[in-house]
């Protein structure tokens, strides 16, 4: 599967697969299964989201994440085009990327990522 381009934009684009390490001086979120870095705390937008299997966080950008094909899903906030995202290291499905929101009030989610809390842990400097 192609990697998900972590930059802004509505499309999941193939990119070179590699493992990124976030600076140790930053509070980070990592995959609970393999400890691959996923996101910096500074990229967290909201803690008030619901994933398929429980609470989830919305991030502006992520690393070490690949994505599947986009599909339309009727979510709690309306119809969206989303692509499942997975950890590039252990291949665990983590959540999804919002490709397109069909309701004007939900457009802010486009290009953003949902990661379920059950699939991530806090690392570095949370004391």
From Swiss-Prot:
Entry superkingdom: Eukaryota
GO MF annotations in UniProt: metal ion binding
Tissue occurrence = Widely expressed. Detected adult brain, lung, colon, small intestine and ovary, and in fetal brain, lung, liver and spleen.
Q: Name one Pfam family in it.
A: Yippee-Mis18
Q: Which gene encodes it?
A: YPEL4
For Zn(2+), which residues are the binding ones?
A: 31, 34, 87, 90
**PTM annotation (Phosphothreonine): residues:** 92-93
Q: What family does the entry list? A: Belongs to the yippee family.
Q: What is this protein called?
A: Protein yippee-like 4
Which cellular components does GO assign to this protein?
A: nucleolus
User: Which UniProt keywords are present, listed alphabetically?
Assistant: Metal-binding, Nucleus, Phosphoprotein, Zinc
Q: Which InterPro entries match?
A: Yippee, Yippee/Mis18/Cereblon, Yippee_fam
Task: Name the predominant localization.
Answer: nucleus
Q: Where in the cell is it found?
A: Nucleus, Nucleolus
One GO BP on record is: negative regulation of erythrocyte clearance
All copies of the Yippee domain together span 27-124
PTM Phosphotyrosine: at which residues? Answer: 98
């Amino acid at each position: 599967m192609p990697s998900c381009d972590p930059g802004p934009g509505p499309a999941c684009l193939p990119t070179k697969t590699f493992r990124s390490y976030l600076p140790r001086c930053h509070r980070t979120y990592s995959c609970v299964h393999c400890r691959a870095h996923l996101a910096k705390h500074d990229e967290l937008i909201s803690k008030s989201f619901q994933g398929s299997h429980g609470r989830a966080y919305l991030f502006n950008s992520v690393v070490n994440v690949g994505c599947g094909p986009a599909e339309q899903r009727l979510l709690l906030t309306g119809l969206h085009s989303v692509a499942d995202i997975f950890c590039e290291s252990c291949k665990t499905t983590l959540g999804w990327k919002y490709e397109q929101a069909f309701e004007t009030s939900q457009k802010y989610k486009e290009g953003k990522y949902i990661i379920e809390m059950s699939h991530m842990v806090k690392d570095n400097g949370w004391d």
